[in-house]
Amino acid sequence: MSKSFKLHSVFKPAGDQPEAIRKLEEGLENGLAHQTLLGVTGSGKTFTVANVIADLNRPTMILAPNKTLAAQLYGEMKEFFPDNAVEYFVSYYDYYQPEAYVPSSDTFIEKDASVNEHIEQMRLSATKALLERRDVVVVASVSAIYGLGDPDLYLKMMLHLTRGMIIDQRSILRRLSELQYSRNDQVFQRGTFRVRGEVIDIFPAESDEWALRVELFDEEVERLSIFDPLTGQLQHEVPRFTVYPKTHYVTPRERILQAMEEIKVELAERRQVLLANNKLLEEQRLSQRTQFDLEMMNELGYCSGIENYSRYLSGRGPGEAPPTLFDYLPADGLLIVDESHVTIPQIGGMYKGDRSRKETLVEYGFRLPSALDNRPMRFEEFEALAPQTIYVSATPGKYELEKSGGDIIEQVVRPTGLLDPLIEVRPVATQVDDLLSEIRIRAAINERVLVTTLTKRMAEDLTDYLSEHGAKVRYLHSDIDTVERVEIIRDLRLGEFDVLVGINLLREGLDMPEVSLVAILDADKEGFLRSERSLIQTIGRAARNLNGKAILYGDRITASMEKAIGETERRRAKQQAYNEERRIIPQGLNKKIGDILQLGQPSMRGKGKGRGSHKMADTTQYQSLSPKALDQKIRELEAKMYTYAQNLEFEQAAELRDQVHQLRQQFIAIS
C-alpha cells in the first residue's frame, strides 16, 4: 500500500514561496501542461517544488542537466522525504566508448564500457519504485531519454511468490535463471541466489541491504522472510514478494526466438541491397557479424551489443520511439525540469549525434539498418511523452517561455532576506590590476572570488599572473572531469584557495555561499558567454553572500549588460521592499561544506530492526581520496566484508557494511 508524501523540514514557506506553491498547484489541478518557475538564486526553488510534490501526492521525475546537479538534488529530496521513495537514475557507465567506424583511416572502434554496479542497483530500484508505489521522486539526468527495457516485458518476466503457493524448487530456480540471476553458494551478493536443502536465498538486484529467504515444504512455499545477507539475522516475514529481473534488458525466450527470425529476414534483404551495389566486403562483414550474434542469442539468450536489435526485442515498428524511463512514469506523473535553460537544449541534441555515428556503421556493413532504432528519444517524442511539466530556472529559455505562455511564476523574494549582488561597471584598461586589489580585500576577510574570462588562453594567463602576485588561485576548465570539478569547488569553499578562474562557471549550479565577488572580464563583448542569460546566471553566483557584489569590466554598456543589470536591480528592489515591509535583516547562508558530497545521509538508513539501530560509520579518513582510489577502497572493503561474513564474524562484517554504504553515497555524489 503506497504511503502519502510527508515533507520533513524545519522551515515553512516564506517570501515568494507560498504564492509560487499556490499558483503551481492551481495550474496543475486546472490541467496546465506547461508552467515555468522563474526563481532567483537562493530563493528556495527546490523547497517550493518539494511542497508541490507533497501537496499533490503524485509520482514525480526531476530532470537535471548533469550528474553533479542530480546528486545535489537527490540529497536534498532525501532530506525532505526520508519516509518516501527518493530514487536516483543516471548513466551507470563510469566509462563508455560507443562502437564507431572512421572510413578515412578504415578504423573500427569496438564498444568498450565500464559499468558502475552501485548506480545500476539504484536504477533498478528507481524503476521498481515507479512500478510498485506512488510516493516516488526519481531524480534523473538526461540518461532518462535513452532506451531502457520495455516495461511490459519487464513486468511479464517478474517472479511472484506468495505464502502457500504450489511451486516446486526446480521451477523457482529455472525462473531465477531466466531473470539472469546466477547461482552462487559460496559468495552471496546482489543478483545471485543460493540453495540449501529446501531453502532458497535470493539477493534482489535492486537491493544492497536485505535479501529474501524462500522456505519450501515439498512443493509448497511455507514461509517468505526478509533477512540481513551479511549477518543472516531474520528481520520479518512477508505474505508475498516479487522478484524483479537482474537487468532492465531481460527478454522472454519466445520473444528472442521470434526476434531471431525477424533479424534473419532483414539480413537477407540487406545482403541483396549490398550485393546489388557491388559492396562485397560490406556484405561479407555484415553476414559474419550478424550470424555470430544470432548464434550467441540462440545459445545464451543474449549477445554483445544486443541493444542494436532492440527494435525486434521490444516488438516495435521501424522508426518508433524506444521505451525509456518515461514509459515507467504513470500517466498522472509530474515532470520537473531543473535548470531548464540547459536541460532542454541537451534533450534536443542527443539524437542527432547518435544518429550520424550509427549511419556510418550501417553504410559500411557493421550493423543492420534496424540498429538506427536503438537511440535516444527525439525531441518531438519527448514532448509527446512528457506529462504535466514545471520548468525551473533563474533564466528560462525561449522554449520554456513560449510553452508556458502567461503561466510564468516568479520567485524573486528570498526568505533569508538576501539581496541580489550590487553591480558595478568598470573600464577594461585597468581590469587585471583592479581585480587583483579586489581579490586582496576579499582574501583578507576570508571571502572567495569567481572570475570569468572569454577564452582558455586568457584564463590560463590570468591564473599565472594572479599566482605570481601572491593570490591563491585555481583554474577550472572543460578538460577537468565532473569529479575533480566538485573537489575544486569544495576546496574553494574550504579556503584552500581564494580565487577560481574559469570561462563558463555559471552551469555548476552548486551552492557557494562563501563567494562574495564575481568579476566578469570583457563583459562588453556580445556573444554566447556574455548574453543576458549568461550574465544573470554568473552574477547570481554571488547572490548567496551578505556582501555579494559583481564587477562587470567593459568600456561600453551593451544591450545584454543593460538588460542583466536592469533585471538584477529590479529583483534587488523587490527584495529590499519586502525586507523593509517585514523588518527582515538579511542573513547569510550557512550551508555545510560536506553537503555538496553528501546524499541525505542521516535518512539513508532504514528504521527497522537490526538495520537502522547501528551508529553512523566513520569515513572521514577517506574524504580526501580521488574517485578512482575511492572506488578501489570500496572494492577492498567489500571483499573484507564478505570474508568476515563467511568466517561468521558478523559484527566486523556489519561495521564494514556501514562503511561501504557511506562510501558508496560519497562516490555517487562525485561521479
Swiss-Prot record:
One of its GO terms (biological process) is SOS response. It comes from Yersinia pestis (strain Pestoides F). Forms a heterotetramer with UvrA during the search for lesions. Interacts with UvrC in an incision complex. Residues 431-593 form the Helicase C-terminal domain. The beta-hairpin motif is involved in DNA binding. Disulfide bonds: none annotated. SMART domains: DEXDc, HELICc. This is UvrABC system protein B. One of its GO terms (molecular function) is ATP binding. It comes from the Bacteria. Residues 26-183 form the Helicase ATP-binding domain. Gene3D superfamilies: P-loop containing nucleotide triphosphate hydrolases (3.40.50.300), UVR domain (4.10.860.10). The UvrABC repair system catalyzes the recognition and processing of DNA lesions. A damage recognition complex composed of 2 UvrA and 2 UvrB subunits scans DNA for abnormalities. Upon binding of the UvrA(2)B(2) complex to a putative damaged site, the DNA wraps around one UvrB monomer. DNA wrap is dependent on ATP binding by UvrB and probably causes local melting of the DNA helix, facilitating insertion of UvrB beta-hairpin between the DNA strands. Then UvrB probes one DNA strand for the presence of a lesion.
